[in-house]
Amino acid sequence: MLAQLKKHLTLHELWEDAKFFFLLNLGLVATAVGIAVFKTPNHFAFGGTSGLSIVLATLFPRWNVGAFMWFINAALVVLGFAFLGIRSMGWTIYSSFALSFYVSLCERVCPLSAPLTSDAFLELCFAVILSAVGAAIVFNIGASTGGTDIVAMILNKYTSMPVGRALMVSDLGIVLVGAYLYGPATGLYCILGMILKSTVADSAIESINLRKVCTVVTSNPQPVSYTHLTLPTILRV
């Protein structure tokens, strides 16, 4: 049994698994920094579990954003187990709790009671870029950041409701509550952040997956065919 396991776990597969785990955590850390350093101090509640946690932390100041993310993500994971099963959840379970851990760690290492600067738009840009790029890294490797993605998976399995529309409605609801709590200016920043995040995330994913294609016209195709077959192997070495 052990010999068969060693046979299947080749060095290349171990490297791919290590790279996947590193990129997953890199994306989650970037997202967590965007939440803890830029979104939370400015009350940028533009959707998702982080936005809901920011609102709840304002209503119940005894708990911080990281604590509420733990509670919400734990509840969503339980829902995922009940409606989807453990196989369908996959890395979503890890991502949900790892993101909560990284946010709590950022709040412990760098506690902020006020924004870093007086420029709200500058902070919005960093909040959007870090969150969007982090999400793009995670989505590009076939994982997710957890949270409301679990709700999307449940809706996709049991209803005919378009997932994107359902999540947009829930995010808009969080934004409206944020606008009521923090004022119209913050509410408008939240709406802008919600729009920019999806745009930046799509652009980041396209940039990561960018490929160059060339067409070779030749009367001697054999050397070109040989190069086409051997070049990917050479690049992997």
Task: Set out the residue ranges of the language-model regions.
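Core subunits and conserved enzymes of cellular information-processing
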Residues: 2-221
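Conserved small/polar residues in nucleotide/adenosyl-binding loops
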Residues: 227-233
